[in-house]
Amino acid sequence: MAETKEFKTLYNLFIDSYLQKLAQHSIPTNVTCAIHIGEVIGQFKNCALRITNKCMSNSRLSFTLMVESFIEVISLLPEKDRRRIAEEIGIDLDDVPSAVSKLEKNCNAYAEVNNIIDIQKLDIGECSAPPGQHMLLQIVNTGSAERNCGLQTIVKSLNKIYVPPIIENRLPYYDPWFLVGVAIILVIFTVAICSIRRNLALKYRYGTFLYV
C-alpha cells in the first residue's frame, strides 16, 4: 500500500482542519480517555485506518471546532451541494458554529440511549480507493461518545467525495468557474468510488489493526 498514490476525500481536509484548530486553541489532549473506540466497521477497499486519541474535557469547544472545520471544508462545493450535505449531517449553515446543532443534539440522544460506558463502536460507512491508489482514514477518538458520534456522521458524508489535487491546500477558494469544474470532477469520482466498493464487516478492533 505504501507504493500506491494516496486517494483523498473531503474528509481528509476536514480532519486536517479539525486537528489544526485543536492545536491552535492549545486544548490539552493528554487527559485520560473516558471512551475508547472498540471497533470500526464499514465498507473498505484499499483503505488504511489510523486511530488517534485527542481526548479533552471541553466538549462544547470541541464540537464548535468540529462544526467550524466542516463549514470551512464544504465551502469548496457549490451552494446547493453545501446545503444538501449540511442538512444531511444536521448542521445549519445559517447558524454560528458555536450554536448547538441538530447533529450535536442527535449525538447527545444517541449516547444517552445507547448508554456507552467506555467502549464505542463506529460505523464509518465507506472507505474505498481505485486500483493502484490507497486511502488513509484517520479517526480521532475525542474521548466522548457524543463527539465521536459527530465525527462518525461527518465521515460518512465527506468520505464519499473525492478531492482532486488541484484543490488541495487551496481552502477556501471561491472562483465560480473553479467550483463548477470541481463539482463535475466530484460527481465523476463519486460514481467511480461507488463502482469499486465491497463489503467488509470489521476493519478495526481495539488493539488490533486490519488492512485491506
Swiss-Prot record:
Q: Does the keyword Flavoprotein apply?
A: no
Cell location: Virion membrane
Q: How is it modified after translation?
A: Disulfid bonds are oxidized in the cytoplasm by OPG088 protein. Unglycosylated because produced in viral factories instead of the classic ER -Golgi route.
**Which residue intervals are topologically Intravirion?**
197-212
Induction comment from the UniProt entry of this chain? Expressed in the late phase of the viral replicative cycle.
Question: Which terms are listed as keywords in the entry?
Answer: Disulfide bond, Late protein, Membrane, Transmembrane, Transmembrane helix, Viral envelope protein, Virion
Member of which family?
Answer: Belongs to the orthopoxvirus OPG053 family.
What is the protein named? Entry-fusion complex associated protein OPG083
The species this protein was found in: Vaccinia virus (strain Western Reserve) (VACV)
State the gene name recorded for this protein.
OPG053
